[in-house]
């Protein structure tokens, strides 16, 4: 199965802290580290350049100039150029980013939101896959609103999929995300398993109660991953803002994950110990 060698992400100044975690954890678990493609703005590009990373980082410095200094609340209050709000425009930049990255990465690119924290090496993609998506694995009432798949973690290698994705954004029920199930129609689709891109929503909005889902988490100490398991398999990545303090769902999820990592922080799990030290400074 093909390995992932290229990552793409969006980052303005409000995502710098998240991006530090993304790059640190990509470096921690992958050798060599994947090449990273970033859409950013002129103000944020120097901040990104200053983040330590052993792999190559390509930055399109003016791609997000229209969003310089703006957070999600700011963007949602402004009219967009293409869509109803500037935030809808911003999320659709993912389609342009993927097309740009694929110009030099014909074997495929994994898009990651900047707030992805890797806890193990990158997953592999099965041969013959056209599109790899991450299901939310949440209640149907929530997928009806937000989409079956999460737009913060996906892979493809055909640039035409980026164009189709942008077209579908025009009628999507939730920004660039609610249309992903339509993008998957008539494609050779691979769905990432539960251990990949695990967000707070999977724990708090799951079909089963949180107490049942928490029981799926376990510990298996080994140097090849953080040592956290879900359904007895290594947890590959989580989707969270580590610096978030005001949003309760995110904050409680962070405490839950960090408590597991801290239990694993020992001489037998050196990389996990390094990760805990890094996260404690966020």
Briefly describe each language-model feature range:
Residues 1-76, 80, 104-106, 257, ...:
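N-terminal anchoring/stem segment of glycosyltransferases
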Residues 14-15, 43-44, 64-65, 116-118, ...:
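Short, solvent-exposed loop/turn segments at secondary-structure junctions
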Residues 17-20, 92-96, 174-182:
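A structural signal for well-ordered alpha-helical segments within the folded catalytic domains
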Residues 26, 98, 115, 154, ...:
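A residue-level signal for conserved active-site and pocket-lining positions in enzyme catalytic cores
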Residues 59, 63-86, 204-225:
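Charged, glycine/proline-rich intrinsically disordered loops and linkers
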Residues 89-144, 148, 156:
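GT-A fold catalytic core of metal-dependent nucleotide-sugar glycosyltransferases
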Residues 112, 149-152, 176, 234:
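Residues that flank catalytic or metal-binding motifs in active/ligand-binding sites
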Residues 157-258, 264, 270-273, 278:
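Catalytic core and acceptor-binding pocket of nucleotide-sugar-dependent glycosyltransferases
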């Amino acid at each position: 199965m093909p390995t992932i060698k290229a990552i793409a992400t969006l980052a303005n100044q409000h995502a710098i802290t998240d991006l530090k975690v993304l790059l640190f954890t990509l470096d921690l678990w992958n050798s060599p580290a994947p090449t990273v493609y970033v859409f950013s703005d002129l103000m944020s590009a120097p901040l990104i350049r200053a983040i330590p990373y052993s792999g190559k980082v390509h930055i399109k410095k003016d791609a997000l100039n229209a969003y310089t200094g703006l957070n999600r609340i700011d963007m949602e209050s402004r009219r967009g150029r293409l869509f109803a709000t500037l935030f809808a425009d911003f999320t659709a930049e993912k389609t342009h980013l993927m097309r740009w990255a694929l110009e030099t990465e014909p074997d495929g690119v994994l898009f990651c939101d900047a707030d992805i924290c890797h806890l193990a090496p990158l997953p592999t993609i099965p041969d013959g896959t056209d599109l790899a998506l991450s299901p939310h694995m949440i209640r149907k009432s929530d997928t009806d609103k937000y989409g079956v798949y999460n737009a913060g973690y996906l892979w493809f290698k055909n640039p035409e999929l980026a164009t189709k994705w942008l077209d579908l954004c025009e009628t999507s029920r939730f920004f660039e995300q609610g249309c992903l199930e339509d993008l998957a129609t008539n494609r050779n689709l691979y769905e990432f398993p539960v251990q990949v891109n695990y967000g707070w929503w999977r724990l708090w909005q799951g079909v089963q109660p949180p107490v049942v889902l928490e029981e799926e988490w376990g510990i298996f100490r080994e140097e090849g991953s953080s040592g956290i398991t879900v359904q007895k398999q290594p947890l590959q990545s989580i989707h969270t803002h580590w610096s978030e303090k005001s949003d309760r769902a995110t904050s409680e999820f962070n405490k839950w994950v960090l408590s597991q990592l801290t239990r694993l922080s020992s001489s037998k799990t050196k990389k996990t110990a390094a990760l805990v030290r890094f996260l404690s400074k966020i």
